[in-house]
Amino acid sequence: MRKTYHVEALWDPEAQVWVSRSDVPGLVIETATLAEFEALMRVLVREMLADNDGVHEGASVEWTSRGVFDLQAA
């Protein structure tokens, strides 16, 4: 059975970047856009799992994003 790893993209309103929270050993991501986050995550997760967790046959990765912003009244 394949192990499922979890990656969450969290918006840091102070720094204005997306940052990662994850159970993938060694994974640290910080990007300006969610599209950049996803693209980088797809590359780095594979590398981090191979280098730090000995995963070479593949794994499942569940990822989510979460952010909060202030909405000004119209």
Language-model region placement:
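Short aromatic-glycine-(Arg/Gly/Cys) micro-motifs in beta-strand/loop hairpins
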Residues: 10-23
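Short, charged, surface-exposed hinge/linker loops at domain edges
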Residues: 1-10, 35, 39-74
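A short, exposed loop/beta-hairpin motif centered on an aromatic-Gly-Thr core
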Residues: 25-36
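Short strand-coil-strand connectors
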Residues: 3, 23-25
